[in-house]
Amino acid sequence: MEVLSVKDLKFSYYLNETDTFHALQNITFSVEQGEMVLFCGLCGCGKTTLLKLLKEEIRPDGKMEGEIENRYGSMQTGYLFQNPEQQIVCRTVEEELVFGAENMDMPRDEMARSAAELAAYLGIEKMLHESTQSLSGGQKQILNLASLLMMKPRILLLDEPVSQLDPVCTWEFMNLLKKVREDFGLTILVAEHNLDLFLPEADKVIYMENGRINYQGKKDLFIRKMFQEEKKFVESLPETVKLYHEAGGTEEWPFAAATLIKALNQEQRKVLFPEDLELEESLGGQEVILIRGGYFRYEKNGRDILRDLDLSLYSGRIYGLIGGNGAGKSTLLSVLLGYRRFYRGKYQANPGMALLPQNPAYAFLKDTLMDDCRMIASVERIEELLNEDVFFSDVRQWLSKNPLDLSGGQMQKAAVFKILLKDPDILLLDEPVKALDGYEKEVFLQLLKRMKEKGKMILVVSHDLEFLQRVADECLFLYDGKISAQEACGRMFVNNRFYTTVKGKIKGMLQDESFITN
């Protein structure tokens, strides 16, 4: 049964009183009851714009043409935002859970019964009376999903729902999503760069390019088409699929590490997964950040967010910082930059430090990107950086735009451009690739490596472990307020079970003789 139909949809944003930007052109597709449809494409292709147009209350301001027919209407269509913070409005979890239902005038006895039943079903009873601000990012996103389910939706629209979640929270969220889809027969439309998670679950893939649909259909044909035609987007495909293709595979694409191993012969395994790990030799360089016995808390009588922290970071290296949501990673960056201070311990840092905030919107103050950049750099310096690296090749066309009007990936690139105008020697990056497609990640990776060669020290906080394995010299694991592990990324990911990569997981399996025997 068809539950959603879009015919010849066109949409343009108003840039000013006379100019418009054509974001979507001739969009036509339909969705069947219970389907999961994955929308994907390079940054700025129009995924989020399309998703928002399907939910009447949050449609962006602009000119829309064409037809959108929703069998269930907007009231039974829930929208989950990328940023967990963006959707929460109440003080406690219990208040947030019923907030939407209250606004729909659900009878109080029905609302109380539904809240109790849903909390038990999702396993969130223990956090009902907690403050929403005390929750981790993963808990907030699960609460957002629960709040939507309270309103008994038939269709869910998800905009990069796990991009800001750590691996464990992502696993929990995906399991819950599968559960509610199967139990309630929900129809799910998701816009996502992380195809590793959603492509295996998708019934249909819609690939967008420059505001148009370039492909819609089954995922097997989609993967084959990407390898044949869309070279840029290949970087966004699941790691297992790329490795299988590298080994010569062309069909029956594996989405799990164990499935990939079984599909490869012994010689292919040796080529793709050599036994040698990265050597942890000294890379030299000058110590640019030193912490000994650092303690930090937000309130005088509160708990320590960082405690007995020791850390030494050196020039000419790239470090990855990982850990769970709420572990204190962003707090540590704010202390390093001087926004906050340890109340006990020793801290020394060289000058010339810059921070890319987790929310790139915080990097901008003016109405145009050019005005923002002119606050800290000359026109000559702006022009120099525009021509310096291919990562910034499309930034020039955004200079006259309000940076807050850019897509998530475009805003991320614009924020990186702005902070690099000062040519910092120490660069702190908080989730820098969360809104970038695979191709943009690869170009950004090469930019960071060139900066490393110039002697820069770069600390990258990210939940994208595949990216960290390729870019970082060492990974630091922040747990319980201190660095619990620090070693070469390849070695760490082989030893880890949850905070790991596809290659790390497979190398760990290949070291397990019982697994290979079976």
Task: Report each predicted region and the residues it spans.
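A short, surface-exposed alpha-helical micro-motif characterized by mixed small hydrophobic
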Residues: 198-200, 468-470
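H-loop/switch region of ABC-family ATPase nucleotide-binding domains
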Residues: 192-193, 462-463
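Conserved ABC ATPase "signature" region
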Residues: 110-127, 382-398
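Conserved ABC ATPase signature
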Residues: 131-135, 402-406, 410
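Conserved beta-strand-loop-alpha-helix hinge in the C-terminal portion
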Residues: 212-240, 482-505
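The feature captures the beta-strand-to-loop junction immediately N-terminal to the Walker
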Residues: 40-42, 322-324
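Catalytic Walker B motif of ABC-type/P-loop ATPase nucleotide-binding domains
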Residues: 156-159, 427-430
